[in-house]
Amino acid sequence: MAEYDLTKRMAPFFDLHLVIPLLEFIEPRSIYDHDSLIKVHRRVLLKTNMIDSVIETYPEGEVPKELEQRKVEILSQREKLKVKVDPVVEILESEPVKAMMDSRELTNNRILEYVTANHGLTEEMLDSLFRYAKFQYECGNYSAASLCLDYYRNIVPQQNPNYLSALYGKLASEILLQEWTHAKDDLTKLRTYIDFNPFDTELESVQQRAWLMHWALFVYFNYPKGRDEIVEMYLNQQPYLNTIQIACPHLLRYLAVAVVTSKTKQKNSLKDLIKVIDIERHNYEXPVTXFLTCLYIKYDFDEAQKKVEEVLSNDFFLTACLEDFRESARLLIFEMFCRIHQCISIQMLAERLNMQQVEAERWIVDLIRTYRIDGAKIDSKLGQVVMGAKTTSVHEQVMENTKRLTFRAQQIALQLEKMKLDKKVCIILNFIYCEDFRNF
């Protein structure tokens, strides 16, 4: 099971606080040695100010005395920061200022000019607000951090060196509070900033897009139609697809699940996804991607069925949609099998799908009606499923060939880009410690 776990591979792309839920998720699943995992969990917590959580990892009576001392120091520091930030919050919570921040017509610069001129707000006071928000976040007080960061990002200009960190911090706070509607809004704002604020180097742009896609997993797998948005962002936006291929091919697991389980994107996206999976097979392969490879490239149905069974329930992000994936995978196996054989007995299909014959026939009828599978008919007398021949128009052939040529051109451009960035991409994977909210 450990060979399919992506926690270690993905951790460098997350903030420490976002890694903690992943560790808590895998602890009871016996994927790794329990004692070793507890020590890792403790080391992660020690890099935060969540001292009470650290203490809980020790057996009763074995808590180091220095932790109690550190707890006292943290409480003292929080009070000192609070004294400095209280006047700032009082200004920002005044009715005129709140009305200005709620207005979509005023820029951050205009609001800052007003507050500076009329309330004496200084740059030092704003820095105090940011430090207090970050401190509350490190203590695990995500509600307080979210509130302060919301004030901060609504008043400082985007050129401020802490602005991007505030966007990340606000998103992380909402994720950890499981406020998915707010998190979705924050994710959109962060993506807009990354997409429309070119960074100094292409390497930095790749870093930012890689972080964004990893953090987005928390939101998209907990938000209605989030899987469709994964397909739109990860597969249909070339800069993000390039980033996956250059820096984080393991995200193909989540893209594959999103495509397979999507009710609206699956049909149009499967071909493009399979091409990418085939190209990246030497960089990343997992039960999910291998299932599609077996089904659409090798045409190995027995192996494909085994791969479906191997899809793990031990993935933090995929547990909620695992049954959807299995059901959709069963449909893909059925459709592909019938398209190749054109005529097949329901009894054989039932065996393939691990179902009783009557149950399988009912299931197939429902599938044909629900998904409108082209040309599929059931001959109940003969106990067969018959797939009618589908003719492809000249227009469809031209469109498909054009798409194929476009895809190949994009892949050639990507390979050239890879040659330039391969020597530098290790920086991304080793970029574990940082001074802002992305500090893992």
From Swiss-Prot:
<protein>
    <recommendedName>
        <fullName>Eukaryotic translation initiation factor 3 subunit E</fullName>
    </recommendedName>
</protein>
<dbReference type="GO" id="GO:0003743">
    <property type="term" value="F:translation initiation factor activity"/>
</dbReference>
<dbReference type="GO" id="GO:0033290">
    <property type="term" value="C:eukaryotic 48S preinitiation complex"/>
</dbReference>
<comment type="subunit">
    <text>Component of the eukaryotic translation initiation factor 3 (eIF-3) complex.</text>
</comment>
<comment type="similarity">
    <text>Belongs to the eIF-3 subunit E family.</text>
</comment>
<dbReference type="InterPro" id="IPR036390">
    <property type="entry name" value="WH_DNA-bd_sf"/>
</dbReference>
<keyword id="KW-0648">Protein biosynthesis</keyword>
<feature type="domain" description="PCI">
    <location>
        <begin position="219"/>
        <end position="392"/>
    </location>
</feature>
<dbReference type="InterPro" id="IPR000717">
    <property type="entry name" value="PCI_dom"/>
</dbReference>
<keyword id="KW-0963">Cytoplasm</keyword>
<comment type="function">
    <text>Component of the eukaryotic translation initiation factor 3 (eIF-3) complex, which is involved in protein synthesis of a specialized repertoire of mRNAs and, together with other initiation factors, stimulates binding of mRNA and methionyl-tRNAi to the 40S ribosome. The eIF-3 complex specifically targets and initiates translation of a subset of mRNAs involved in cell proliferation.</text>
</comment>
<dbReference type="InterPro" id="IPR019010">
    <property type="entry name" value="eIF3e_N"/>
</dbReference>
<dbReference type="InterPro" id="IPR016650">
    <property type="entry name" value="eIF3e"/>
</dbReference>
<dbReference type="GO" id="GO:0071540">
    <property type="term" value="C:eukaryotic translation initiation factor 3 complex, eIF3e"/>
</dbReference>
<dbReference type="GO" id="GO:0016282">
    <property type="term" value="C:eukaryotic 43S preinitiation complex"/>
</dbReference>
<keyword id="KW-0396">Initiation factor</keyword>
<dbReference type="Pfam" id="PF01399">
    <property type="entry name" value="PCI"/>
</dbReference>
<dbReference type="GO" id="GO:0001732">
    <property type="term" value="P:formation of cytoplasmic translation initiation complex"/>
</dbReference>
<dbReference type="Pfam" id="PF09440">
    <property type="entry name" value="eIF3_N"/>
</dbReference>
